[in-house]
UniProtKB/Swiss-Prot annotation:
GO terms for molecular function: hydrolase activity. It comes from Xenoacremonium sinensis (Endophyte fungus). Belongs to the AB hydrolase superfamily. FUS2 hydrolase family. This is Alpha/beta hydrolase xenA. Pathway: Mycotoxin biosynthesis. The keyword Hydrolase applies. Alpha/beta hydrolase; part of the gene cluster that mediates the biosynthesis of xenoacremones such as xenoacremone A, a compound that shows inhibitory activity toward the PI3K/AKT signaling pathway and which has the ability to induce apoptosis of A549 lung cancer cells. Within the pathway, cooperation of the hybrid PKS-NRPS xenE and the trans-acting enoyl reductase xenG is responsible for the formation of the reduced tyrosine-nonaketide derivative. The alpha/beta hydrolase xenA then accelerates intramolecular nucleophilic attack to give a pyrrolidone derivative. Disulfide bonds: none annotated.
């Protein structure tokens, strides 16, 4: 298969950027210019390449806005936002450049939302201890409305995505199909992690409950929005797919879209480490200090492993690999207390997996099919599974490179279960 980079990780992330082109997140010429200067496993060359393209796109956007070209300015601001997101992506979260470029990505995106066809609400959702969860509520323009009130999709970020990037899957497409899309960042995601150092939490149903309460309050205070709280779906990809299943235990969620989720983060980690050594540590035969030293040495010699370990420690709120792996045990659909999370899910579920054998993380055999079997409270008529092989069909993790097709399959599923009727064109 053709690759953009000899680095598996760089190739995946480049495909991720180019894959957003169908929704306005990338231009092929800008992509090729950036690609020309990126070196294998060299984060500085990645940074320089995307910084150049981000600043270029922002300049084009500013010029288009000054000239009164709404659509052209919007499109360029969207690309600039995505490129600024990519700029610092390969750095650890403690790098001084991460927050400034995240802020630039947000600023360009917010400028783009001012130029969109439908109304976009920038929201702050009350969470706990005075903390709010940031998000965008994309509303359908009047010409795209479907009969009745507006169905809602709550779309959660994953381990490394941002609420701005989420636009390029459902945020752009959903409103054009009559759906309201709430793209949000929870604890351990986006600036809540990078700036506030708030880690991920495994019981995402708690987070989802706060978001659902917010939607209820918003609907009561602004009835003119016509949000249909009887038709709320939850969606997420990879780690977000796990979060979507946890959120679906709330009866207010009426449909769940879980894209390439993991079943257990601990079990997933076992597929990516020397298992004999790992099990010796887990059983107490290898001291923490020895295990941490080994992991640190491995991280220094392997760029992808180092990046993943640093993100893992950051998102788990710990300083050592041993603490990270212990926290991984909490991120599961079958916690150690014996609770069977999936027994609490009764709504229709659309679940996907990567079938190409090129999965970045969770495989379909270890996660997707297992989850399908354990969703015993969901009738077969309300369970849909999609595990494509070819990259064009969504064979890569999180359906990278096939977001347009994923969006089509998602809204076909939601239309069916939310009884949205459309006319054949």
């Amino acid at each position: 298969m053709f690759t953009f980079s000899p680095s598996f990780m760089f190739d995946f992330e480049l495909t991720r950027i180019l894959g957003s082109a169908s929704s306005g997140g990338c231009d092929v010429g800008e992509f090729k210019s950036a690609l020309n200067t990126i070196k294998k496993n060299d984060p500085e060359s990645w940074y320089a390449a995307w910084k150049q393209q981000a600043e270029r796109a922002q300049k084009i956007a500013d010029e288009a806005a000054k000239a009164g070209y709404r659509v052209l300015a919007r499109n360029a601001y969207l690309r600039a936002s995505n490129y600024f997101r990519a700029t610092s992506y390969m750095f650890n979260n403690d790098d001084a450049r991460v927050i400034p470029f995240t802020d630039k990505s947000i600023a360009c995106f917010k400028r783009a939302t001012e130029l969109m066809d439908g109304e976009v609400l920038s929201v702050d959702i009350p969470y706990e201890d005075g903390i709010t969860l940031p998000g965008y509520l994309f509303l359908p323009p009047q010409y795209a409305r479907v009969p009745g009130k507006i169905p809602v999709v709550m779309y959660a970020a994953g381990a490394d995505s941002t609420k701005e990037e989420l636009y390029f899957l459902y945020g752009g497409t959903g409103p054009q199909l009559g759906y309201a899309i709430l793209c949000l960042e929870g604890p351990g995601q986006g600036l809540l992690l990078k700036k506030n150092k708030i880690p991920l939490r495994p019981d995402f149903e708690v987070v989802a409950a706060k978001v659902l309460d917010f939607l209820d309050d918003l609907s009561r205070s602004q009835p003119a929005l016509e949000l249909d709280l009887g038709r709320i779906a939850m969606a997420g990809a990879a780690t977000g797919g796990y979060f979507a299943l946890r959120a679906a235990t709330d009866p207010r969620i009426k449909a769940c879209v879980s894209i390439d989720p993991f079943f257990s983060l601990w079990e997933l980690s076992l597929t990516r480490v020397p298992q004999a050594f790992f099990k010796l540590w887990d059983s107490g035969w290898v001291p923490d200090g020895t295990f941490d030293a080994f992991t640190d040495r491995h991280a220094r010699g392997n760029f992808q492993a180092g990046w993943e370990i640093n993100l893992g420690k950051s998102s788990m709120g710990v300083e050592k690999a041993t603490g990270m792996f212990r926290r991984f045990k909490q991120f599961t659909l079958e916690p150690e207390d014996g609770t069977k999370i999936l027994d609490k899910v009764t709504c229709p579920v659309f679940i996907t997996g990567p079938g190409s054998g090129q999965e970045m993380y969770a495989s379909a055999d270890d996660s997707t099919f297992k989850i399908q079997r354990l969703l015993t409270k969901v009738p077969d008529s309300k369970k849909e599974i999609w595990v494509p092989n070819d990259v064009a069909d969504g064979g890569l993790t999180a359906k990278i490179g096939a977001w347009a097709l994923l969006a089509q399959k998602t809204f076909e599923f939601l239309d069916k279960h939310f009884e949205v009727k459309r006319k054949e064109l």
